[in-house]
């Protein structure tokens, strides 16, 4: 009887060993083929540039080719709607980029978008680019943020700020100021890329621009632009002498463009860990880091609970501002 029991124990142990080994081998074989990386914008934008620069390094880390495809439209939602429905089996070799705070436009009830943060499988953050407000160097009306705010209050709806699209990080930064700084009312020019913003500023169609640090640093070095503030929790390493919005005004106006990589919802944890580890390994490649530094793009390696908590807090802030209800 003892012998039979002992035989069963041995059999179970062997069976479990076989299952464990098979699972391990299967995990080690992932990915089995090329990875598709989806950019939710048309070719030529910042995320597209980053994706194409990053792809060869991720390919090396994974040991398989990485193909970048563009799926623009709907302010990112043509692609994001598909990402939220990716099948963990059929789409296990597909990853995509999600941009914040742009993706949080789902909070706008007018969009009737049923997706939310829980609709996505976030792997890891990749890069973060704080916003900044800039004016023309030498503008006698204002050269500091307190001067700018005071002038706006004294001249409501007379100052024009050029920003990106409606609901973009640039727009939300201005909307936050309108919501929480009494008397701060400005006109806005929407839908401009950064080059167009500068044309409007230099041509005096706009009095100020809202954008991301990475694009404007080279123009600041030319001595044509005066940064009023950085809209981050800390000062930027690229602009160490420029105060944060909070330092200069006492208002906690934090806004930025952040890029996060996602995989199919429900993807097995072991596969998600392989992808996350490879992405972060590629980000740590010295050559890649230098190339992003030259482009003034700040890498942002955060995952798991910290990433989810960060995004949840951001969604709460956007929900309080309700930029969609403010005057355009």
Where in this protein do the model-derived segments appear?
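C-terminal lobe and pocket-closing loops
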Residues: 128, 215-284, 313-316, 328
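Hydrophobic core
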Residues: 14-20
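Hinge/capping helix and adjacent helix->loop/strand transition within the periplasmic-binding protein
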Residues: 58-61, 82-94, 106-196, 245, ...
């Amino acid at each position: 009887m003892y012998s039979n029991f002992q035989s069963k124990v041995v059999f179970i142990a062997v069976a479990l060993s076989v299952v464990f080994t098979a699972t391990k081998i299967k995990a080690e074989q992932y990915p089995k083929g090329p990875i598709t990386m989806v950019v939710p914008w048309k070719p030529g934008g910042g995320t597209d540039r980053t994706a194409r620069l990053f792809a060869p390094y991720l390919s090396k880390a994974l040991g398989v080719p990485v193909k970048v495809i563009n799926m623009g439209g709907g302010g990112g939602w043509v692609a994001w709607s598909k990402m939220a429905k990716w099948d963990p089996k059929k789409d296990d070799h597909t990853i995509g980029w999600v941009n914040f705070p742009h993706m949080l436009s789902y909070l706008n009830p007018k969009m009737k978008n049923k997706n939310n943060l829980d609709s996505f499988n976030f792997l890891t953050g990749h890069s973060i680019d704080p916003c900044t407000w800039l004016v023309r160097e030498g503008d006698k009306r204002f050269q500091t943020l307190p001067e700018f705010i005071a002038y706006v209050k004294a001249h409501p709806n007379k100052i024009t700020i050029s920003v990106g699209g409606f609901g973009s990080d640039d727009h939300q930064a201005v909307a936050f100021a309108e919501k929480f700084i009494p008397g701060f009312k400005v006109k806005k020019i929407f839908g401009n890329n950064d080059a167009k913003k500068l044309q409007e500023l230099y041509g005096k169609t706009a009095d100020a621009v809202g954008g991301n640090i990475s694009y404007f640093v080279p123009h600041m070095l030319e001595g044509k632009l005066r940064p009023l503030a950085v809209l981050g929790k800390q000062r930027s390493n690229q602009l160490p002498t420029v105060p944060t919005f909070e330092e200069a005004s006492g208002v906690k106006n934090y806004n930025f463009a952040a890029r996060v990589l996602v995989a199919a919802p429900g993807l097995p944890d072991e596969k998600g860990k392989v992808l996350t580890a490879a992405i972060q390994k590629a980000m740590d490649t010295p050559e890649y880091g230098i190339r992003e530094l030259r482009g003034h793009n700040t890498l942002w390696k955060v995952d798991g609970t910290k990433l989810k908590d960060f995004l949840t807090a951001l969604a709460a802030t956007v929900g309080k501002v309700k930029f969609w209800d403010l005057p355009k």
